[in-house]
Amino acid sequence: MKSIQTPSKSHTNTKETPVMSQEETKGYNPREIEESYYKIWETRGYFEVEGNAQIQKPNQNFAVMLPPPNVTGSLHIGHALNHTLIDIMTRYKRMDGYKTLWQPGTDHAGIATQNVVEKRLLSKGIKKEELGREAFLEKVWEWREESGGTILSQMRKLGTSPAWSRTRFTMDEGLKNSVARAFVKLYEEGYIIRGNYMVNWCTHDGALSDIEVEYDANKGKLYHLRYFFKDSSDYIVVATTRPETFFGDTAVMVHPEDERYAHLIGQTLVLPLIGREIQIIADSYVDREFGTGMVKVTPAHDPNDYEVGKRHDLEFITVFDKEGYLNHHAGEFEGLERLEAREAIVAKLQEKGYIEKIEEHENQVGKCYRCGNVVEPYISKQWFVKKEVAQKAIERINSGEAAFYPAQWKNNYNAWMKELRDWCISRQLWWGHQIPVYYCDCGHEWASETTPSHCPKCQGSQFHQDPDVLDTWFSSALWPFSTLGWGNGEAGKGSWWREEDLQEFYPNSLLITGFDILFFWVARMLMMGEHFLDNLPFKDIYLHALVRDEKGQKMSKSKGNVIDPLELIEKYGCDSTRFTLAILCAQGRDVRLSSQQLEISKNFTNKLYNAANFLLLNASSFKTLDEITPQTPLGRYMASRFSLCVEELRGALDGYRFNDGATVLYRFLWGEFCDWGIELSKANKEAINELGAIFREAMKLLHPYMPFISEHLYQKLGGARLEESTSIMILPYPKANWREEKIEMTFEVIMDAIISTRRLKATLELANQKIPVVFIKAPQGMDESLINTFIPRLAKVDSIELLSEKPAACVVDVGEKCEIYLSTAQLDLSPIISRLEKQQEKLQKEVDKLLGMLNNEKFVANAPQNVLEQNRVALKEAQTKLDKVKVELQGIKG
């Protein structure tokens, strides 16, 4: 394919900030390069859908959505991983000729945003209720305009390339319209219903869906209470972890087949302190083997009791209000906060003789995922999406219409969907999408996409809108298609979205997100996309794991191990940070982020920079592989290895094996090109121009992972500057089309012979001396002229002789591809043998000692884990050294 030359005049912006040449600085300065290049890329529109128009292939489209971060948020290390992976795929597809859309945007984050603004107002002594709903919402919008774009600007520092001109917000006008349409359609289809249900209730944030409740282990108490029979001194004992809710008991239940209590069914008990009468009932829900086999029933404050209450038509008594304060049903305790009331209630029960015993007890306590408050089961009138709306999405996932990466997440998805319940979508907040349902004084209820002027039934104007807002995840569930114009009306048409977007970009090609929101977000997008567009929203779903510290611990402020990605970028550069995250990201495994790997990545950028400088010492500029065909043996060899790199890298990226792709790049660029290609060129200067062309082409491969240094070195090696040239990011991605296995085999022997000769000379303490001759036993068919071109120069040998049998009086080094023999006729080997034998003896003792300790069961049982790990590492190192000495001795002794 012809290479793209200089940019069109529209891409030559005289106002672009010049990038300081690296010759004017001390080494590679990523900070300067990154800021300057990013401005040029964004100004030229490269990130947009038509940014690569000149290389786009017909009917090749790629779409990926940014999981919209909270508008309140700032970039954390999980974002950095997620955005890096998305950007790698986006840049790869863009260079490969796809019309590419990476859709950016932010989420209005109902609870989080309202909390932030409420706290700001409270710091000024203002409560939101004093302002009223409309004035408060104005304050939220003001805050959003001031601070809501922070995370998007931080994303730029990571080198990401979304279509910024299309940035959406889940409460922009178009998405408001989309949300209203989705709600009304589901409402009219009977999939959205309203009713009194038991919900998870946070006294601060209101109703929560099941997956918004996080469960923590709690060391509490189990209170055994005496419930006396009516007009009797006899009693039964029931247990509870929440004595403050017993005021809502409306029965005690036993198993209908439990002979111990059959005679008690139907008898009347009297509740302690308040004297209300309840009956003993029979229900098969009771586990006869657990505790006493008698269970108190509190239908308004326990989800299982709620179902029992419905079966037996029990009274549902709510004992505290929405703020968590006990009501009149609690008698003298009315007005106390539910958790603070516990101590007073228990004290009173003890005083009156109603406590049988109190035991220590560990249980799981549900807490609000936002504020950490203890969540209560609470009966409330709420809006729900019926679980049946998800059924077709489940079927289509299991028919293979979308694939999970790693594949095991499909099992997790199915397991969760099997237990799916109706989704509570109403929230008692002011900030968010207000539920588009209206209530008229005439009693009529209806849903409308637009604000109505009158009641459609009585034509009257005395109506009001439901005060609740939708769960934030409702609007996020529409993200893969609402951002493409579905339900937007005319809002944003031609700027945020285009007429053809749904046809070109739905279903999205790929979703990349964390596994932790599989159920919050991914499952809901699947069901909404299937329901409204009759197609799953993604072809592939890649779920990455957590980023942990180098010890494998989850990051938390309390541990002090939180890593700020912006600090990493400042210290190591954007490219090094991205490359580290990618090379550590193996499918299904947590990312263990370490300073050691970051240093390795930083050294990698310096290695590349130094390689380019070496090439430029020999030529002022280099062409590309589109313009020249390698002719020298070294050029052909490196071109063949480059082609293998292309093949393996494409395979890794197409399978979302980001770590494998990074490893392929590292192996080729450092291990093959820098370590060997440049080294071998010292004996073959004619290959320099070809190596320069290959290195430039390799920068295209590197670009999705390390966009800045790849751009810089590509331009620099071409004798150009980005200000006057087309960016590497819209040049065609290389294809694998050049393999020469025979020449690869020859150079493998050459390199192996150089390594073996150097190793043998070092063993014989001749490393810096030039020796007259080395004998090589190699596979047949080797090009003798090539062997004599490279080995003598790089191994410091006068001559090479190929042979088929081992010569007499020689020491040997057996490599992977050949055997090297060096004559010992003129050498006294006894001091070397003596030294190596002493080393062998010392190392053997060390290995035996460590093995003895690690095989000692008592030592292993009592030693700290870090000591055991240190000993295992020491054993591995000692064994490696011992094996090396043995090989050297064997080679010398023949």
Swiss-Prot record:
Q: Write down any Gene Ontology CC term.
A: cytosol
Q: Does the keyword Kinase apply?
A: no
Chain spans, region Disordered: 1-28
Q: Where is this motif: 'KMSKS' region?
A: 554-558
Q: Which reaction does it catalyse?
A: tRNA(Val) + L-valine + ATP = L-valyl-tRNA(Val) + AMP + diphosphate
Motif 'HIGH' region mapped to chain = 69-79
Give the compositionally biased regions (Polar residues): 1-22
EC annotation from Swiss-Prot or TrEMBL: 6.1.1.9
SUPFAM superfamilies hit by this protein: Anticodon-binding domain of a subclass of class I aminoacyl-tRNA synthetases (SSF47323), Nucleotidylyl transferase (SSF52374), tRNA-binding arm (SSF46589), ValRS/IleRS/LeuRS editing domain (SSF50677)
Task: Kindly list any coiled-coil regions of this protein.
Answer: 832-894
Question: Where is ATP bound in this sequence?
Answer: K557
A single GO molecular function term of this UniProt record: valine-tRNA ligase activity
What enzyme category does the UniProt record give? ligase
According to its UniProt entry, the function of this protein is described as: Catalyzes the attachment of valine to tRNA(Val). As ValRS can inadvertently accommodate and process structurally similar amino acids such as threonine, to avoid such errors, it has a 'posttransfer' editing activity that hydrolyzes mischarged Thr-tRNA(Val) in a tRNA-dependent manner.
Protein name from the UniProt record: Valine--tRNA ligase
Q: What is the lineage of its organism?
A: Bacteria, Pseudomonadati, Campylobacterota, Epsilonproteobacteria, Campylobacterales
Report which gene this protein is encoded by: valS
